[in-house]
Amino acid sequence: MAQVKRIRRSISGILVLDKPRGMSSNQALQKVRWLLNAEKAGHTGSLDPLATGVLPLCFGEATKFSQYLLDADKGYETVMRMGITTTTGDAEGELLAERDVTVGRDDLEQALPRFRGDIEQVPPMYSALKKDGQPLYKLARAGEVVEREARSVTITRLDLLSFEPPCATLAVSCSKGTYVRTLVEDLGQVLGCGAHVAALRRTQAGPFALAQAITLETLERVHAEGGPEALDQFLMPEDSGLLHWPVLQLSEHSAYYWLHGQPVRAPEAPKFGWLRVQDQTGRFIGIGEVTDDGRIAPRRLIRS
């Protein structure tokens, strides 16, 4: 008997997952997509398998806005293991060197300020960045080390939460593209003992925090009790990641033309920048940008 093809649901929204340790971001996405039986899905930037915490997952029309979440600032809590360096900069790598730890709390506190603000980071070899079309982690697994250009990142918070040698727990708030593994390795180098990430938990991704995150266990339990439809309660609106943007509500007349790809005028709109756009009923219909002549040009539209 031929297998009946599963008909996926055309759902739309954002689900904030508390990603479990040991699972890649894509594995987590595909698992939740299967539970929701969703037609279209995407995530908003990878978390290492070692890491846990906030991973916003976009479904349906919300995938059109995932790039803007990818660009958002992030927050983390990380356990820094001093005295040991590894090939990957975290606990999943092979041992490179082991040294005695004579670092005191004051030593660590005094080292932190140099890593706050705008700093330069050299991306790790074990990363998804590409060199001549090849992911760096694949080159690293083949034993290759290639030159990487330093990149500017911003660390807005770097605080010591606890100090229990040889481990220390740090709170980090940072711009996109920041590698906490590299931050910890560089800090270990300054301290003279080396270090790696023993644990990493993302606490914030743009406007989303741990308080909004749902565990995979919860999703599986609710799915077992009520099927895919029971999980819709965890979906947030498509524009949930853009609530810090200005909002513009169009008249019925203007919304009609705007949804057909035509820039429109709106006297109450800001003079520049990006906007969340709503129709006359307050329904989110897409994002727009103010053009040089003051009109609102549609950039990404919600399919009705």
Curated annotation (Swiss-Prot):
EC number, as in UniProt: 5.4.99.25
Enzyme type, top EC level: isomerase
Keyword tRNA-binding part of the UniProt annotation: no
Active-site annotation: D48 (nucleophile)
UniProt keyword annotations, A-Z: Isomerase, tRNA processing
Entry-linked CDD domains: PseudoU_synth_EcTruB, PUA_TruB_bacterial
GO biological process, one term: mRNA pseudouridine synthesis
One of the record's GO molecular function terms: tRNA pseudouridine(55) synthase activity
Record field: catalytic activity: uridine(55) in tRNA = pseudouridine(55) in tRNA
SUPFAM superfamilies reported in the protein's UniProt record: Pseudouridine synthase, PUA domain-like
Family named by the database record: Belongs to the pseudouridine synthase TruB family. Type 1 subfamily.
Protein function: Responsible for synthesis of pseudouridine from uracil-55 in the psi GC loop of transfer RNAs.
Record-given protein name: tRNA pseudouridine synthase B
Species assigned in the record: Pseudomonas aeruginosa (strain UCBPP-PA14)
